[in-house]
Curated annotation (Swiss-Prot):
Family to which the UniProt record says this protein belongs: Belongs to the small GTPase superfamily. Rab family.
Protein name: Ras-related protein RabF1
Any GO CC annotation of this UniProt entry: plasma membrane
Localization (cell): Cell membrane
Modified sites of kind Cysteine methyl ester: 187
Pfam families registered for this protein in UniProt: Ras
Keywords linked to the UniProt accession: Cell membrane, GTP-binding, Lipoprotein, Membrane, Methylation, Nucleotide-binding, Prenylation
Binding site for GTP: 15-22, 62-66, 119-122
Organism: Dictyostelium discoideum
GO terms, biological process: intracellular protein transport
């Protein structure tokens, strides 16, 4: 009997309320768009993607962005990647990204992979967050960055695939380090 999937990755969507985390979740898992669903607390959906023909199962957790529902350490426990989302039409949501990064630093595994996502890039005339500034900020933290649109399905798949590939690379690097044992010094003491 063969395995159903090559890897299982838990991803958490984090960011302020109203930035479109739920819309991203529905777009990536069901290829649908909704503006009316309200997340209370936390929920998750499953998505299988294929990398080099191998099935990779994603467990994607959607979190409410309100302070009273803020993600805590139990939500980050065991996660492989965090998608930090801000709204390109809401400067404050971008200014709060460092606070979300601090929560991740505090509660998640130190090796968790992060990506910063600017959602709603289809609203060109309402854009207030400069994408070059956002890219510069992400680069300064060595975190990948993408602008997307959950509504128009722009760059969503690409963002998730890049996160999956980073997770696979991390696993392969870790595995390689474990198999390479340091050279032993042959020392004879008389």
């Amino acid at each position: 009997m063969s395995k159903e999937y090559e890897h299982l990755f838990k991803f958490v969507l984090a960011g302020d309320s109203g930035v479109g985390k739920t819309s991203i979740l529905f777009r990536i898992t069901d290829d649908t768009f909704t503006e009316t669903h309200i997340t209370i607390g936390i929920e998750f959906k499953i998505k299988t993607v294929y990398i080099e023909g191998k099935p990779i199962k994603l467990q994607i957790w959607d979190t409410a962005g309100e302070k009273r529902f803020r993600v805590h350490n139990s939500h980050y426990r065991g996660c492989h990647g965090v998608i930090i989302v801000y709204d390109v039409t809401d400067q404050r949501s971008f200014e709060n990204v460092p606070s979300w990064i601090e929560d991740i630093r505090r509660y998640a595994n130190e090796n968790v992979i992060k990506i910063i996502i600017g959602n709603k890039n289809d609203l060109v005339s309402q854009k207030v967050v400069d994408p070059f500034l956002a890219q510069e900020f992400a680069d300064s933290l060595d975190i990948p960055f993408k602008e997307i649109s959950a509504k128009q399905s722009i760059n969503i798949e690409e963002a998730f695939i890049s996160l999956v590939k980073l997770c696979i690379n991390r696993i392969e690097e870790t595995s390689l380090k474990k198999t390479q044992s340091p050279e032993k010094n042959n020392c004879i003491i008389n």
